[in-house]
Amino acid sequence: MDDIAEKLGCSKKTLYVFFENRKDLVLRVISNDMKKHELEINNVIAKKLHPIEEILSLNVIAINKLKTCHPSFQYDLKKYYPQSWSIFDKKNKQLTYEVSIQNLKRGIKKGCYRKEINPEIISKIFSEKVDLVFNLIAFEAITVSFSDVFKELINHHMLGIVNEDGRKYYLNLQKK
């Protein structure tokens, strides 16, 4: 708490007025950050964009978020603040799943995603794959950023769900 108090220009005693301990501080910061992230996502969804454009807009939010994450974020949170990690992980996967399933259903209805895909299964797989972005061990042999890994994940996901019309639409948007 010393380093946090110093950066904020206040005493530790003042910090303890607002936060019970470091775990409480981390939990509240994570919770607040997740609320902001969910609001950003809901703002994109409220625009009622084409399903492919929606995914690309959400992708921009995710990449900007990933650019602010230190490479050890997930590891440190899991190791030192397991309660905060559990809340973050559960909420993130739940949000990803819910947004994905709605997007897939709209995309199938709109005729840009393959009719034969199962939105529940694809959404579950996707929500679990997003966690892979933070897996430093999986990518330690190559030098890539979180955002590069996420871009490839989205591209792989998109090309797996779109039909021919959706593919043309997606590739055309990629050129812009």
Model-based region annotation:
Residues 30-38:
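Short, basic, alpha-helical segments at the C-terminal edge of helix-turn-helix-like DNA-binding modules
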Residues 44, 73-77, 137-140:
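Secondary-structure edge/capping motif, primarily at the C-terminal ends of alpha-helices
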Residues 28, 41-72, 123-126:
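Hydrophobic alpha-helical connector segments
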Residues 102-106, 110, 139-176:
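C-terminal peripheral helix-coil segments that are non-catalytic and often amphipathic
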